[in-house]
Design a protein with these regions (language model features):
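Dual-mode signal for accessory low-complexity, basic/Gly-rich regions
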Residues: 288-357
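Long, well-ordered mid-to-C-terminal structural blocks that present hydrophobic/aromatic surfaces
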Residues: 250-306
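Generic recognition of flexible, low-complexity loop/linker segments
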Residues: 14-16, 194-195, 204-206, 248-251, ...
Length: 407
């Protein structure tokens, strides 16, 4: 891949994704196999005005080794130096950039129960720090092809060609062409216009129907609003948290989901694929879950904590989105969630609540924003998906027909 194109992508991440501000610190998190592109992103951050750029390197093989060799108690422990680093982030609010390149199968073979226990133990310590930073800093998740990931997506290609093809797909879906920054300005404007229309309807419930058996009704929080594309921090900095993105999303009301929904794409979770699954909801809670493969893993996901069985997101994405048009299953939620409509189990987004900077976390939980240690997207979009908005004034308005926007 031409370095000029990669530098344009790095600039997009720094200036449109994270929207680095002059004098701001930046923390980049990436795998060890990406030193060249990480250097490009760091350089782009400095050009955008960053005061300091720090890189946190990860290595999936070491993570797998630790899960296998360390005790659950050790894995759950948040060391004093980790707490100090988290407090430093609370105090300084650095911009965060996450570059994904991991092998989708990289954690295969480790105990899902052990991973879940480790995560649960750490979450209780980390959550207060996370809550203090909520909505106060910019962050961006973007992707870089790793060899194992590329071979998973393109198994019949050589390693070099698989990486090249994955680069091409990433750059295409992220609109990295003649003028990517202008393209993203236009894309954000289109998503915002759709959100504005949806927010004007006064939606009480969304009703999903598809020929695969999906029939689900989800309640909306009156104070919630659809968001899409870029978003603002409490301090007013505009950024794009996901590159790419095609969704208009909202956090539904905890306790108000009735019916059944069927997946339309596999869910890659903990190095394994959960395929052809369905989830049935009663009073908002997932009460039944079945899958053709890895049903036990799906049920373990839903039982991760109390909030994991409730919905945290409803996202509207047309079935003919640029990502779906590639015909590629990326085995990566950042991309696959933007291929078609999806729901998410677990944590809701407080920034979908109007006037959220002036509300307490407790108030937003009381409104119905779900809380959980997980947030797992799963795809439900189909070519015939119909979504109807039932509004508080009694109207029923088509939102999706035949898998795409009805307006």
């Amino acid at each position: 891949m031409k370095k000029t194109v990669l530098r344009a992508y790095a600039r997009l991440i720094a200036e449109v994704g994270a929207r680095v501000q002059k004098g701001q610190d930046v923390v980049i998190e990436a795998e060890l196999d990406q030193p060249e592109f990480v250097t490009m992103v760091a350089d782009a951050c400095y050009h955008a005005g960053a005061r300091k750029v720090t890189v946190t390197w990860k290595h999936q093989a070491l993570e797998k080794l630790a899960i296998r060799r360390e005790s659950v108690k050790t894995l759950q422990t948040v060391e004093d130096w980790e707490r100090a680093k988290l407090q430093h982030y609370v105090d300084t609010l650095p911009c965060r950039i996450y570059l994904l390149s991991e092998d989708p199968d990289g954690l295969r073979g480790v105990s899902p129960a052990k991973m879940a226990s480790a995560r649960q133990g750490r979450y209780s310590v980390i959550k207060p720090y996370r809550d203090q930073m909520e909505g106060r800093y910019q962050w961006c998740i973007a992707a870089v092809p790793g060899v194992a990931w590329a071979k998973k997506v393109f198994p019949n290609e050589t390693k070099a060609r698989a990486v090249e093809k994955l680069w091409e797909a990433i750059l295409h879906t992220c609109r990295v062409h003649d003028d990517p920054i202008a393209a993203w300005d236009a894309h954000n404007a289109d998503l915002q216009a759709r959100c504005d229309y949806l927010n004007s309807l006064g939606i009480e419930t969304l009703e999903y129907r598809a020929s695969n058996g999906t029939h689900l009704t989800v309640g909306m929080i009156p104070e919630a609003q659809f968001c899409g594309g870029g978003e603002y921090t409490i301090g007013g900095s505009y950024f794009n948290p996901n590159l790419p993105t095609e969704e208009c999303f909202i956090s539904p009301k905890r306790g108000e989901a009735e019916g059944i929904v069927y997946s339309s794409k596999p869910l890659s979770y903990q190095g394994q694929l959960i395929e052809d699954f369905s989830i049935r909801f009663e009073r908002g809670r997932a009460v039944e879950a079945h899958a053709r493969t890895n049903e036990a893993l799906l049920q373990k996901l839903i039982a991760m904590d109390d909030g994991a069985a409730y919905l945290g997101e409803c996202a509207l994405v047309p079935y003919d989105s640029p990502i779906n048009q590639t015909g590629i299953l990326f085995y990566n939620t950042l991309f696959d969630e933007n291929a078609c409509c999806h729901l998410a189990l677990g944590m809701g987004f407080i920034d979908t609540i109007r006037d959220y900077p002036n509300r307490s976390l407790e108030e937003m939980r009381a409104l119905g924003v779900n809380d959980s240690m997980i947030h797992e997207d799963f795809m439900i979009g189909t070519p015939d998906l119909a979504i109807t908005a039932h509004c508080r004034d009694g109207r029923s308005v088509p939102v999706f027909r035949d898998g795409t926007w009805a307006f």
